[in-house]
Amino acid sequence: MTSATNGGSLWGARFAGAPADALAALSKSTHFDWRLARYDLAGSRAHARVLQRAGLLTDVELDGMLTALDGLDADVTSGAFVAAESDEDVHGALERGLIERAGPELGGKLRAGRSRNDQIAAFGRMFLRDHARLVARGVLATIDALLAQATAHHGVAMPGRTHLQHAQPVLLSHHLMAHAWALLRDVQRLQDWDRRAAVSPYGSGALAGSSLGLDPNAVADELGFDSAVWNSIDGTASRDVFAEFSWIAAMIGVDLSRISEEIILWATKEFSFVTLDDAFSTGSSIMPQKKNPDVAELARGKAGRLIGDLTGLLATLKGLPLAYNRDLQEDKEPVFDAADTLELLLPAVSGMIATLDFNTERMEELAPLGFALATDVADWLVRQGVPFRDAHELSGAAVKQAESRGVELWDLSDAEYAAISPQLTPELRTVLSTEGSLASRSAQGGTAPSAVLAQRAAFEAQLAPVRDFAR
């Protein structure tokens, strides 16, 4: 069976017959590209104006065109105008709507000097630039939640871990700020990406540019871009801006997943570091006692989805010769999904973090355990002039002695330390405390309370510019 007509498409005159129903179904994209309708209409207004400036529309025709486009925009917004079954894509649907309102003679003039190839490349960038700012706001809300918890628990110690084993005491605020720094870089990446996304492919035509005297920079300016592309082939064929957005989205997903993994662990009975707020946890259909960290688990799961969006898009792009290929119809759903996923996920994650109830007593109790002060012993010896290689050995011997007795380092007697080495004098006890360990790490980047306060000031200085971007 074949379609009775090729109406709703922007091509067909050179063909003897209509496309097969199977091809028409495969080609149809209005079910996902309709969300670009308002960008398409904005582009049509800008295009009409450059047609008029080039002498291809009269002033009267321009007024009629803009009136028809405004009416179509209102009908799209209200839902009075939607894509028809015969429409191949958003571009064809909106041209149909324009012709219905302006008539075929005037409405048919708008397509001069533009192609779906440059339209979709430009409108995709416009969509992503808007949604980059929405995503940035969500990430900033998550950062703010981390900062608020860091402020509220500035002096609280906790076990710092490597390999998930006790390593050295750190401040909870220092740990939370580590996650905040990662997310700050994500927003900075979006801000940096936006400079590359702010170049308009509109005016590139199918691939070779326009011969009608149209000004692509005028369209770029009206649509909020910084400039037009310098290479029309690159403008229509490249999707690195899409892929880069998807990579940043995946990185945000990974960073949220790492936070979430810790919260899942911290909320277990074995850790008991945090209690989840009822508003951000769920129960079990069979076990009445359960309080499940579903937000954190879904964040962890959706990170895989975001990585999948990126890898799928890159796989689509990897084999495409210049310039445009129909494979690029597949460029939109991955980035649409990435934006949608983060815009859904981020409010839940920021809310979960903001409402965490930290069991600070348990965190501080566990902070020095597991011989977490062993490095402080070695560092103390270094300050006494002992080479670090020897200091490391002596500290390890003290750990072995304490472990054999089932006690911590501070439980060893002065005599036991002296038996290990005369260099382990009673003055060693000045560092055998959580407070002493923390205070000693006062260099930039350290976990001492003073260093964390300095870190916070540096963080705020970098945060201000990205807040401006997200507005």
From Swiss-Prot:
GO CC terms, sorted: cytosol
Reactions it catalyzes: 2-(N(omega)-L-arginino)succinate = fumarate + L-arginine
Entry keywords, A to Z: Amino-acid biosynthesis, Arginine biosynthesis, Cytoplasm, Lyase
InterPro entries registered for this protein in UniProt: Arg_succ_lyase_C (IPR029419), Argininosuccinate_lyase (IPR009049), Fumarase/histidase_N (IPR024083), Fumarate_lyase_CS (IPR020557), Fumarate_lyase_fam (IPR000362), Fumarate_lyase_N (IPR022761), L-Aspartase-like (IPR008948)
Annotated pathway: Amino-acid biosynthesis; L-arginine biosynthesis; L-arginine from L-ornithine and carbamoyl phosphate: step 3/3
CDD domains found in the cross-reference section: Argininosuccinate_lyase
Coiled-coil stretches: none
Locations listed in the record: Cytoplasm
Record has Amino-acid biosynthesis as a keyword: yes
EC number: 4.3.2.1
GO function terms (MF aspect): argininosuccinate lyase activity
Primary localisation category: cytoplasm
BP GO terms, sorted: arginine biosynthetic process via ornithine; L-arginine biosynthetic process
PROSITE patterns the record matches: FUMARATE_LYASES
Protein name: Argininosuccinate lyase
